Amino acid sequence: MKDDFNDEEEVQSFGYKRFGIQEGNECTKCKNDWALRVAIALLYVLCALLTIAVAVLGYKVVQRMDNVTEGMQNYGGKITAVETDLKKLDDQTGEKSENATSELHSFKLEFQTLQKQLSDVIVKTSNNRAVLKELQLAGEDMQSGHLSLRDLLESNANVISKVNHTLNTYNSLIDGLKTETARLQSDLHVQTSEQGQNSHSISTLNFTQTQQRNLISSLQRSVEDTGQAVQKLKNDYQSLQQVARQTKADADWLREKVQNLQALAANNSLLTRSNSDSLEDVTSQLTTLSEQVQNTSTITDSHDQSLRELMDQQRDHDNATSIRFDALEARLDSNEGEMDRITGNVSFTTQLLRAISTDLNGLRTCSETVTRHSELLHGLNNSVAETRAESTELKAQQEELAVRLDKEVSSLSIVMDEMKLVDNKHSQLITNFTILQGPPGPRGPRGDKGSMGLPGKTGPKGEKGEKGAPGDAGPKGEKGPAGPPGVPGLKGPPGSRGSPGPKGSRGSGGRQGPSGEKGDPGIPGMPGRDGQPGPTGPQGPQGLRGPAGPAGLEGARGPVGPIGPPGPPGLPGLPAPPIVVPPVDPQGFVNRQVAPPPTTTPGCPPQWKGFREQCYHFSAPMESLNFDEAKERCSNLSSSMLIINDEEEQLWIKRQISGKGYFWLGLKWKPGQPDNWSHGHEAGEDCAGLIHEASWNDFFCTERIGFICERTNESKVPVL
């Protein structure tokens, strides 16, 4: 279009000098003025006619060009409509066209890509047909599997009905066991009340026995004091006897020798009589003391006999209660075994039902995938049919556009040929005329703004942009079906030992032990001093020296000396066997625990046992605590609760606690664990403990059983 307008401007503004017509003196020489004027007028007329013709031709050309531009705009609108249709098709098929331009080459390329895509879709449909055939075969297999699963479900239903029947029977048995356990609990309550009465009577007997022991010890002390007094009296009596003998000898010697001393002898006889009276009083006191000692001995013998009878009765009662408790424990063990079998059967049935439910879920998902695939294939078939129809429509529209473009191009070529012919004619007509070039005319008004050109080619694909920010989190999906139980994990390594707790408060003082046996008698005292020499007699006449006589008789033994100091205390006697009252826990389990004997393991505190590099403290038989109290007690002992790490430690613990009841372990379930079975209670069994043969089980944390504390052996701690 621009070239055509430029040609018009050149036609309107070109000069005639190029045709050889020039202004000069030759025309004035050949022609006159009149001819010149006529020629000039004719030239003006011809110029006017030419301008009119050129204007008419320009108007026609402009009109034709307006028609052509309107047609091009219409074609552009149609092309944009085709592009929008192609974009819609791209949106429906999920593919994006990159080069959608107004050129035929781009249309051909797009149609080739569409043909390739159609061929790919045809290949995919053929593949999907094979997949459909495979899915049909799988569906047939699934139908057969459904039939087999139905048979399995029917068989499982029969098994479940049988299991329900057995559960009903077990329920009846459990009801009977509940009645028996209620009766046993009532018996246990009666026995506990009797045992409490017996313990009260035993405590009263122990109190009376301690009082009797105190009385006996006081009587023994009084007897010892009386014995010492009697010994002193005996010594005095012997000294008095010696004095009496001496006085008798003196009296005889005086009767024989001196008569004038009769008054003195009479006085001496009075003195002896008074001494004999005092001796008689002492003997009467000794007889009364001996009678009192005999009475106390008879009373102590009667008390000892009653205590022996009470001990025998208590021993018989303990034996009977232990036998009954053993029978109850055996029955409870059998009941626990039956309950374990029942729970095993129930768990097996639940596992079967879970497996069946997982299979059904898998079948359901398979059927859903099959239906989804069938819907997708149906949608693909519909989309393929639509793409085929649209491709045929596009081909028809393309052919029509090609025909129209060919017509328009041919018409434009004809117009251009006509314009060239007109230009040639104009050039031929103007060859014989000289046209003076006039002054340039005024600038014409600005033309209207042309129509918007066609869109250019699509540029190359840009670089990949940066990754956008993550979108908002989607809504939480529905909870999926519970998966099958996983394989139990490996046992984790033992945790690091905690820091030792603060030192516990000092325990209460123990009971006073029984008094020891009577010590051995002391060493006999030194022999008494010799008696006083008698009064010197009158010197007789010196007789003749006689022969040496025989040796005289041995003199009388002197009086017994004072009692020596008491000897060292004797060795402590054997302690009496403790009276063990078996505690009863809230569920009726009886703890038959025996106090472990004290050990002297190096590096371990007293009453602790050593094994390898650890020290263990076993609770006393009467010491039953719940889990939190046991944990606090172990922390007060600068230790922690027992955690078994290997089989050797478990075997050693098994040997130590055999027949001693249940003990706490330092393990506890987390909230919501699978084995937190409530068993008809509000809270679950969250704490672990040791039962028969050192096997562990979960208990209620409020139960009161024994506990075991452990700590490192101080002698085996490496020195840094």
Swiss-Prot record:
Q: Which Gene3D superfamilies match?
A: Mannose-Binding Protein A, subunit A
Question: Which GO terms are recorded in the biological process aspect for this UniProt protein?
Answer: phagocytosis, recognition; vasculogenesis
Q: Which cysteines are joined by disulfide bonds?
A: C604-C615, C634-C709, C687-C701
List all membrane-crossing ranges: 38-58
What does this protein's UniProt record list under function?
Scavenger receptor that displays several functions associated with host defense. Binds to carbohydrates.
Q: Where is the Collagen-like domain?
A: 444-503, 510-569
Q: Which InterPro entries match?
A: C-type_lectin-like (IPR001304), C-type_lectin-like/link_sf (IPR016186), C-type_lectin_CS (IPR018378), Collagen (IPR008160), CTDL_fold (IPR016187), Oxidative_Scav/Glycosyltrans (IPR052376)
One family name in Pfam for this protein:
Lectin_C
Regions annotated as coiled coil: 95-120, 216-267, 377-408
PROSITE patterns tied to this protein: C_TYPE_LECTIN_1, C_TYPE_LECTIN_2
To which species is this protein native? Answer: Danio rerio (Zebrafish)
Q: What is the lineage of its organism?
A: Eukaryota, Metazoa, Chordata, Craniata, Vertebrata
For binding a carbohydrate, which residues are annotated in this chain's numbering? K670, Q673, D675, E685, N697, D698
Q: From the Swiss-Prot or TrEMBL record, give the protein name.
A: Collectin-12
* Bias-annotated ranges (Basic and acidic residues): 460-479
